[in-house]
Amino acid sequence: MAADFTSYFPQLVRGLVLVAPGGLIRRSHTTWKSRLLYSTSGLMPESWIESLVAKRLYTGPEVARSIEPEPDTVENAEIKTANRGDAVYASSHYALLPGNPYSTVGAVVDWQIKHHKGFVPAFISSIRYAPVHSEHARWRILGQNIANITKGSGKLKRVYIVLGETDPIIVKDEIIEDARECLGSGNVEFEVVIGAGHEVAIERADDIVRVLGTALHMW
């Protein structure tokens, strides 16, 4: 969202730090099941889709599943199965509030599924319409905005991207390759947090703050 906003309104943004960003996720990773489940074709009643998505999101007391659309296969030490739809993440049991064992990512998602009727439809909508996949064209506009600074048409000088080393959703090597191609190698800087997965922003807040501090100093 931040990258898309900046591509449309470059004059309003001086600096941009993206943490495990969507946008450049390659469509080739999405299985036919997710394509069908999140499609707007009308082949499945919306009530069925909501029920199926809720079951996929619900973790229960012992297991924690990824809440992202899954790719065909992933080979990553953080997960226990080859299909991301069945991937089990230990980090989903990470407490959001220190000292509160009931504030884990999985527990919060479960609570919303049970008590917030708008949560699942909102999640489905975000997957369908948010700029998650194949937004390379808009990212190239970001790169052009940076190149146009000398012409007075933008303020953004550099993009900082923070990635989890073992993130099976925002695949480090792919994002680095595609972001450099879209933005220009000299316009983007990467920080790979060693040992972190997709929940890097939750588990490694100190590393995120350090990158923000560096970026603010540069701006």
Name what the model sees in each region:
Residues 25-130, 134:
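Helix-rich cap/lid subdomain of alpha/beta-hydrolase
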Residues 1-32:
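Conserved hydrolase catalytic core segment
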Residues 13, 27-33, 37, 166, ...:
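Short aromatic-enriched loop/helix-cap "lid" or pocket-rim segments at secondary-structure transitions
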Residues 22-24, 165-168, 197-199, 215:
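Short, solvent-exposed loop/turn segments at secondary-structure junctions
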Residues 174-177, 201-218:
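Post-His helix in hydrolase/transferase enzymes
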